[in-house]
Amino acid sequence: MKKIVLMLAMALGLTFAASAKDTYAHDASVLPEAARTTISNNFKAKVSVVKIEKTMGRIDEYEVVLTDGSEISFDRNGNWDNGEVNNTASVPKGFVPKGVGEYVKKNHAGTRVVGIDKDRSGYEVELSNGIDLKFDRAGNFLKYDD
């Protein structure tokens, strides 16, 4: 009996592992409309690669690499979660909340936002000088991040 239960558990585990396989595409058409709109409104570069992350056959996330090296992650509905650009560019203004942009301009003149992560509690911003900042959802500065 133990062998049967073990075999069933192994088969079930293999099924879940197989259904979690990520897929890749070289075309923006696999992205939700919201993600395609975000890219076209904020970036000049074209989509190079789209990684579609799945768990148990369900899409969890889209990771997009653009031809200029920028990387953007979107949730299954096409809402962006984070974005990074190469160190010679800046994250597009459409990704940076007004309060965040104003704080960076006032307190870190001469730097650029090269990375931004969005989560339930707010934003984490990486500057071109390597400093990381935390902001709440309204764009108010909270602290420097380690």
Question: What would you call each of these model-derived segments?
Answer:
Residues K21, N87-T88:
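Structural motif
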Residues M1-T23, I39:
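Bacterial Sec-dependent N-terminal signal peptides
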